[in-house]
Each structure stands twice: as structure tokens, then as C-alpha cells.
Amino acid sequence: FLIDIRLVMNKKLSIDEISQALIDMGMDLKGQSEDENSELKIEITAEKFDMISSIGIARAINSYLELQEPVINIPLIRGKERVIVDESVKEVRPKTVAVIVRNLDLNAEKLQQIIDVQEKIHESFEKKKKKAAIGIYPIENISFPIYFKALPPKNIKFQPLESDNEMSATQMLKEHQTCKKYAHLLEGAKVYPIFSDSNNNILSLPPLINSHTTGRVETYHKDLFVEVSGHNEHHLNSVLITLVSMLQVMGAEVESMQVEYAHENYTYELNVDPKIKTLSREYISSLVGVELTNNEVIKLAKKKSGLELFTILL
């Protein structure tokens, strides 16, 4: 983990300097290994969600130590591909957000970090995929547009990830180890959500598992379809921004997608506009209990990493 942080730091820091910076930022360090491949154990709380990856932590340290300007926007290419959301998902998993990631130069380490971050988000912040489930797929075998719809479980059949045989959704929930872990999330549902392409190839059964044939990412894949499904679009957008920020640091270009809800006459597209907060210097000083000068307020505000802009009335 420490090695990962150092790869994207703007200055070479010792493990003690990194540890102290994290403590000063209010992070809770749970321990540090003593071997040559030192690891820091850090508790990431919900309000610091953008620091779930080592890239996010490095970016925050860079801003806090004034090694770079805080990142407040994400370059986004306007895309033409679509995800079409069917009304059938309304009662089971009604929302999704999505982008296409292009020209990602993957290696084994980067791919493992993506997988690790995906698992950390699911297990630590998303109530084991109840609030949000992330799906990542190579687009080379996908025919657009993509459909997000729900079907009776007996009508869903594909080869789940890391399995040798095709199975029905009913079988997966009973027999597949990963699916059994999350089966309670679909308990009692008459229909299950799926992502499929325009050729009716099933990409995944969220929040359970991807297809082995269309949802397995390898290091040679450069272009990916990334989706997050759940119930609250604002929250899903935040999760997607966290993933997109990490992938961009890895060298990827991010292309927006239109997520069309025909039954609601509504279209979603990734919102990367920074949040704008208007605060007075007097109010800030009253919160911290110290009278701050104009320059001190500006300097401290710039230490804050994340997609936020502060309009400060000085």
C-alpha cells in the first residue's frame, strides 16, 4: 500500500512523513508493518470516501502538503453510447450510472488495485452491495446500446465469472459461492436485474456477479464499460466519480454515456461539476475557534482535496 502511494506522490516521503501527514489530516492509523514492503493500515470513514484507494490518499496528501493544487474537476469526453433502463428494474434495483473508460494501460498491479478498491467499496461502504454494486467489463465483445432490465430468474442463464458451465440465475443463488454470499439482496424478488447488450448477451446479474464471457477483465484490455447500480442516483454518481478519478490517474480517458429512462422521460449523464460552497471568513473562524486572516483561509481551503469549490466571502 505504501509503495502504491509513493508511485503517485509529487515528492519522495518517508513512511514516517506519510504517517504524520495522515494523522495531521485526521486519519485513523491502525498500524504499520515493519518489513521492507511496508504497509499502512488506515481506517477510511464515509466522509473521506474519495480516499478509498491509494491513489486517492496520495492525491489528498499532495494537496494537504501543498505539493499540488487540489483536483476540482475531471476531464470528460462527451460520448454517444447509451444504457437504456427498462421500467422492469423499478422495484428491484432502479438506478444505474455509467461511463466508458478508454486507452487504459493495464498491468497486473493496476488491475489488482482496481479489484481491491471495488471490493473495499462493496464491503466497507455499500452494505455488501446493497447500496451500490460496481460492474466493470471489457467493451471489445459488447454491442451497444446496453440494456438494464429485469427478468424472471428462470429466464436468466449465462456462465458466471470463474465458472466452467452456464447456469440459470436460480442455480447461481443456490450453488455459486459468490452468488450465495449476496443472495439475500434478491430474496423475495420476482424478477432479477441484468445488464445485456444489443445482441442479448448478458453482461452481469447485479449485485451478484459478472458473466465470464463478457465481464472478465484482463491486463490487455484497454477500453472498459463501468457501471454502478443501486437505489440512489446521487450516491451512485459519487461512487462512479471515485472510480473515474482513480482510473484517470492510471492514464485512462473517460467518456460519458447517456443513461436513458424512457419510462420516466429522463436521461442521466455523469456529473463531474464540483460542489460549490459559499462561506464567510467569520463563519469559518467561528467553527475552528481561531480568528483567521484572509490568506490563512485561502491556504487552508487549498489543502482540501476533492471535487469541491469554496466561494469564500472575505
PLM regions: where:
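RNA/tRNA-interacting regions in translation and RNA-turnover enzymes
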Residues: F1-L314
